[in-house]
Amino acid sequence: MPGKLNDRVAIVTAGGAGIGAATARRFAAEGAAVVVADLSGTRAQAVTEEINSAGGRAAFIKIDAADPEAIQATIKLAIDSYGRLDVMFNNAGMAVVSPIHDTTLESWNRVMAVTLTSTFLGIKYSVPIMRKQGGGAIINTASISGMHGDYGMASYNAAKAGVINLTRAAALENAKHKIRVNCVCPGGINTRVAQVLGGDRAEEFRRTMGAAHPVGRMGEPEEIANTVTFLASDEASFITGAKIVVDGGVSAHTGMPPFLSSKA
């Protein structure tokens, strides 16, 4: 039985771990050829070898997703290797924990570059190819942190909010060219980012973050990959300009203390 992405070609940035790696594997399982791009060539190669060993098709490239030449090289690799580009998953991002008054301009600019500029570049350079081919799908990783504020993460909040509105603008510009552009907004996901944010209290961070979700746990990378795969497929043919929230119910909450929860 053909997969949802049979014979399509996809690029996944930050594809060497977490959501990116899970999505690269899922894309390949659904029949796509995948270019895995990551700042860590070692991680990108490992995911690629795993896909190829399982009978899929994948290539890898070491890139800084905030570098325009690197994004162009990634797209060139996809076309040279597989002949086309059908799906662009702009997944690169980073967070720095710092209150605004302590955030350096260098730190601010780097978060913007890796999180927002990389998404802009992925759209900018994939759109001409997709227009020439007659269509495609672009999915961007935003976050519930782009919908709400967090303590000490202003640069990340601003960058992810930018990803959401960039998604909308790109969707409007490209709808008539049969290019769908959507973003996914994860809640707390069990990736190595949780380790980084939690530092030496990573396990406590995971427990606290999990308890903050109405479903009682953090999400898994594969659960985001499921949504991204849907958005990349023809099953989402009438969806563009959307932000799809996958957060275990966190954003459904007003912030009111759960004093009435026993009556629910």
Regions of interest found by a model, annotated:
Residues 89, 175, 180, 239-241:
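Short, small/polar-rich loop/turn modules that mediate ligand/substrate recognition or access, typified
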Residues 98-101, 148-154, 176-177, 216, ...:
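Active-site loop immediately N-terminal to the catalytic Tyr-X3-Lys motif
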Residues 99-100, 107-112, 205, 209:
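Substrate-binding pocket helix/loop in short-chain dehydrogenase/reductase
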Residues 123, 159, 167:
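Active-site helix of classical SDR
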Residues 128, 172-176, 237:
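Alpha-helical segment proximal to the catalytic Tyr-Lys
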Residues 143:
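Residue(s) in the substrate-gating loop at a strand-loop-helix junction
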Residues 183, 203-235, 239, 246-248:
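C-terminal helical subdomain
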